[in-house]
A protein has these predicted regions:
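TRAFAC-class small GTPase G-domain
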Residues: 1-170
Length: 170
């Protein structure tokens, strides 16, 4: 299937928040229980058809460790959507979101759609970041917001379609 449009999405955030599983869930509809740190970047692509037009969605999973930050910054260029991910059960990953958002605003096109993603809602009993905190941060920074459970794919595909539709309309 030949595509008409190439759209680049990036996934950013601290290490171990679920970025690699977000890529795996969207591209292959799978979840990997075994954690491994991304070294540099990982990449996946998928063609989708909307209103008779074929879009190739490239999703770039960036390393969350500070060691690789200078390498991963190069991948912000030409992104149409940035998923900024944190772990709802790990306060530090939310506290670090500000720096990821600043990088995104500085290095991505001005038109980039930013989506704040609170992951691991299956760990509700260990929640350290309230839904309200995430929602307020997203509003203040002009971002869309969602909480997901990548383990089951809850909300992810529906939300990726919403982000894509928003881009297509604009």
């Amino acid at each position: 299937m030949n595509f008409l449009y190439l759209l680049k999405f990036i996934i950013i955030g601290d290490s171990a928040v679920g970025k690699s599983n977000m890529l795996l869930r969207y591209i292959h509809d799978r979840f990997n229980e075994d954690f491994h740190s991304t070294i540099g970047v990982e990449f996946g692509a998928k063609n989708i058809q909307i209103d008779g037009k074929v879009f190739r969605i490239q999703i770039w999973d960036t390393a969350g460790q500070e060691t690789f930050r200078s390498i991963t910054r190069a991948y912000y260029k030409n992104s149409v959507c940035a998923f900024v991910v944190y772990d709802i059960s790990n306060r530090a990953t939310f506290d670090n979101i500000k720096s990821w958002v600043e990088d995104c605003k500085r290095l991505s096109p001005k038109t980039v759609l930013m989506v704040l993603v609170g992951n691991k809602i299956d760990l509700e009993e260990r929640r350290e970041v309230s839904y309200n905190e995430g929602s307020i941060f997203a509003q203040k920074n002009g971002m869309l917001f969602l909480n997901v459970r990548l383990k089951l794919g809850i909300m992810l595909n529906k939300f990726l379609w919403k982000a894509l539709e928003k881009f297509i309309k604009e």
